[in-house]
């Protein structure tokens, strides 16, 4: 079983004349909740992601940090981020699982000029269709979290799929399945928000007064959320943006030029019809016949 076209609610690069796809049935939005306060940085989730998706990154060089690999890539869809910070005169080691946030309003999808290369399912998962990718990299620029990565081998972009192939058959993502401390949870978005509120309340009783849920409104909310000790300072967690938003360039492109492109297409099509009706399809043939007649007269 796999998702069908009827399960898709958005496609990249569809113009104003293309009707929006409709999900065949109501599907609850799903979400992955990552509780960074119980993560031990074991990287089991990284291994599970690599195994399930059959991706193998090259062995990098040790640069003096625990991060390995050092960054996301086309063959590393999730990495552990480690940050040493000082808060309230105490040294803290903050750990965050990094990867696609699956935004409700995805900047990558809006920026993509290749039709159908990026899609969003009714449950909120944002997926890349690599066979449609043209390798332009616009999705990378459009992502406020700097997640997608271009593979130089095939000139296509890749990212976490939230294990959509597992979710469709009722399984949880591979990283959730393998986490030994239960730091990663998966379910409906509402149930994950409820779980997060319970965890935040517990953290506040332990002295973390600024604990909270990271579910940024600037991108319409996300389908990967974090429970943070210091929710008032998300940038402490390896630069997690405080108020991520779709760039003004992407908004301008989709807000103004997209409808203008649709109008231009319609105008061109209408002009072609009027030309056909008013002038007719045989004008070129008539001119060619006249030219042949003139040449025949000259020969005589």
Swiss-Prot record:
[4Fe-4S] cluster 3 binds at residues 100, 103, 108, 143. It is found in: Cell membrane. One of its GO terms (cellular component) is formate dehydrogenase complex. One of its GO terms (molecular function) is metal ion binding. Its main location: membrane. [4Fe-4S] cluster 2 binds at residues 49, 160, 163, 175. Keywords: 4Fe-4S, Cell membrane, Electron transport, Iron, Iron-sulfur, Membrane, Metal-binding, Repeat, Transmembrane, Transmembrane helix, Transport. GO terms for biological process: anaerobic electron transport chain; anaerobic respiration; cellular respiration; formate oxidation; heme oxidation; respiratory electron transport chain. Binds 4 [4Fe-4S] clusters per subunit. SUPFAM superfamilies: 4Fe-4S ferredoxins. Residues 1-260 are cytoplasmic. The chain crosses the membrane at residues 261-279. It is a single-pass membrane protein. [4Fe-4S] cluster 4 binds at residues 112, 133, 136, 139. Formate dehydrogenase is a membrane-bound complex, formed by subunits alpha, beta and gamma. This is Formate dehydrogenase-O iron-sulfur subunit. It comes from Escherichia coli (strain K12). The gene is fdoH.
